Regions:
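Active-site-proximal loop/turn and secondary-structure-junction residues that shape catalytic pockets
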Residues: 15-16, 45, 86-88
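Conserved beta-strand segments of the P-loop GTPase G domain that flank and frequently precede/overlap
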Residues: 12-13, 82-84, 119-120
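A generic structural signal for short
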Residues: 14, 57-58, 94-95
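Residue-level signature of catalytic and energy-coupling elements of molecular machines
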Residues: 11, 42, 81, 114, ...
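C-terminal regions of RecA-like/P-loop NTPase motor modules
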Residues: 3, 19-36, 53, 67-76, ...
């Protein structure tokens, strides 16, 4: 599909691709569309390693994949947005908000990423919460700026996030807005 909702979006859902094949496809797409700005991968643990050594251990495979995604982003001068699964450790904690250590199969994802943003919805764990319909975007790593939390409205029927009035505040280096409490904390 070349156009989706008026946007020049190319989808490639070829299953079981190696990271080498993904990078080759990205290079080809960049050659065809020099204005290519973003590559998305859903999700990193589904990609396959290219090297025989990395194919033997999943942690090594994810490390190779995350490293190669970082390299292709630099080579092609594009942003790479990559989804990743979490392990189940956060399910065992009283505070279910995900942390960097919860990234599944590899600390290399955390190491290679410029930014790591994790989502949390309290109503998933606590159906009676006052935060029904609220999603927290937890900026756990941000090489280019501050870390923090952004709360948005979550509309499951439309699979859409939208801005909360509390987030209309000054923007910080990472490009996110902060609630009044977070603004005060970041200003300190």
């Amino acid at each position: 599909k070349e156009l989706m909702y008026g946007w020049p979006i190319h989808l490639d859902d070829t299953p079981s691709r190696t990271i080498g094949q993904i990078c080759a496809a990205a290079r080809q797409l960049k050659a065809q569309h020099p204005d290519l700005a973003l590559i998305g991968l859903d999700y990193i643990q589904l990609a396959q390693a290219s090297t025989p050594e990395a194919k033997k251990k999943r942690e090594q495979a994810v490390s190779e994949i995350s490293r190669d995604l970082k390299l292709i982003a630099r080579e092609l001068d594009v942003a790479v947005v990559c989804l990743a699964q979490l392990n189940r450790e956060c399910e065992r904690r009283p505070n279910k908000r995900p942390m960097l250590a919860d990234l599944r199969e590899s600390g290399a994802i955390e190491q290679n990423a410029d930014a790591v943003i994790m989502l949390y919805r309290d109503e998933y764990y606590n159906p009676d919460t006052v935060d029904r319909g609220i999603a927290e975007w937890l900026i756990r790593k941000n090489r280019g700026g501050a870390t923090g939390k952004v709360r948005t409205l979550w509309e499951p029927e439309n699979q859409r996030f939208s801005t909360l009035a509390e987030n209309v505040m000054p923007t910080y280096g990472g490009g996110f807005t902060a609630s009044p409490d977070e603004h005060d904390a970041l200003a300190r």
